[in-house]
Amino acid sequence: ISITNHRLAVAHEAIDSGLYETLQFPFSYLAGEQEMALVRGCREKNMGFIAMKGLSGGLITNSAAAYAFEAQYDGVLPIWGVQREKELDEFLSYIDNPPRMNEELKAVIDHDRAELCGEFCRGCGYCMPCPAGIEINNCARMSLLLRRSPSAAQLSPEGQAKMKKIEGCLHCNQCKAKCPYG
């Protein structure tokens, strides 16, 4: 039996309960000490750890760095959110030639951590639905998505129309109340 969630308190309860064989939780090289503690807790309780959002919803663009980071943790099995065939080919190539952590990949990780760590939307969608029809999980990450992923979809008339809905925000804070990251 496994459990999946995005809330630290629930994850700790699951580990402490002894009822589960695995925990599925967001974990990438943007993870903080709280997520690292979950990995350690699972290892101590002989639980597997399934790392979802290993590419942080598309914000991490260097798959070799992501793979090398995850490979450092015994008992962690990542789920790669592959969106393009090119990405699938990259991960398939790692079966025979897995990336190992080195200074070059550490530099990539350090750069991304400096740019992305802290308060950012992970794109989980727990904030949805919005009573004003705002696609919060994409709108909240738009500045990062424009810099770090192909931008054609975001800059299309449809993408711009979705962003325009922000002007109709009701400021009801339902999204904040539902966000598992605070």
Give residue spans per PLM region.
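Glycine/proline-rich, positively charged
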Residues: I1-A37, R43-I50, L55-G58
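Structured C-terminal cap/extension of enzyme domains
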Residues: A37-G182
